[in-house]
């Protein structure tokens, strides 16, 4: 292990393996850094563990956070309207085999595996982001995943969930496979969205016990709740345009005529 260029190491910090610390970094308290490179202003404290990973830039990693499996944490300000916000990973958050960049926030008991999380996106509470070696989950802009929500990639080609803009996945919702959430989308309750490809855009709320599967486009002020189902079969694409509320036991398996207008 080697430290230089203004690195400060204090407290009971352990630096092991082939670790390199340089460029005004600060490691203190009970931090353990193993086979990792930490540089350019990172501040790491409390009981953080970092294995086999890279941390670069002005960020704060604290609490009992764990970063491992060749994760890359690359902090950068100035790419969003909030110039002051620092990238932070804290509480009991765990980040594995992922890239966390810009000003993203990972905290609570969140678990992030095989993901690319950028801009000011947030994962917190007991949320789970679960990609795989083939497909990384992608969160960007001001997307949020929280509560007990799960966002999961599939193993097929393009089975990549992408959460954009101010979209949110919350409560006990599950979003899986080739799903794109764009402007003002909330998936909550016990809803299941399983693509795909699925596109949700422009003020779409999916909640209750509702379910969306197959090739589905839902856009423009649509609410799906209760036990409602939108399901596409055999290469068909179901397209639902609002304003519309789909509730009760309603089931849509083909494009409503009004949806074509």
Predicted regions and their residues:
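Glycine-rich hexapeptide-repeat left-handed beta-helix
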Residues: 11-261
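LRR N-terminal entry segment and analogous cap-like coil->beta motifs
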Residues: 2-8
């Amino acid at each position: 292990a080697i430290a230089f260029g203004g690195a400060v190491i204090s407290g009971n910090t352990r630096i092991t393996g082939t670790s390199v610390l340089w460029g005004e970094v600060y490691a203190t308290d009970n931090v353990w850094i193993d086979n990792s490179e930490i540089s350019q202003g990172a501040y790491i404290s409390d009981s953080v563990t970092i294995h086999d990973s890279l941390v670069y830039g002005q960020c704060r990693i604290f609490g009992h956070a764990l970063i491992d499996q060749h994760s890359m944490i690359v902090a950068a300000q100035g790419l969003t309207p909030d110039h002051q916000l620092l990238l932070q990973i804290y509480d009991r958050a765990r980040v594995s085999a992922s890239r966390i960049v810009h000003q993203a926030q990972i905290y609570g008991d969140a678990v992030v595996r095989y993901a690319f999380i950028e801009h000011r996106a947030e994962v917190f509470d007991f949320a789970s982001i679960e990609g795989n070696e083939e497909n990384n989950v992608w969160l960007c802009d001001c997307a949020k995943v929280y509560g007990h929500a799960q966002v999961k990639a599939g193993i097929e080609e393009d089975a990549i969930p992408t959460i954009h803009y101010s979209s949110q996945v919350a409560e006990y919702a599950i979003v899986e496979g080739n799903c794109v959430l764009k402007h003002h989308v909330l998936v909550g309750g016990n809803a299941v969205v399983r693509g795909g490809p699925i596109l949700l855009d422009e003020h779409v709320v999916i909640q209750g016990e509702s379910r969306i599967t197959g090739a589905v486009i839902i856009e423009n002020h649509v609410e799906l709740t209760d036990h409602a189902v939108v399901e596409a079969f055999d290469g068909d694409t179901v397209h639902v345009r609002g304003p519309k509320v789909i509730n009760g036991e309603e089931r849509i398996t083909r494009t409503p005529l009004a949806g074509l207008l």
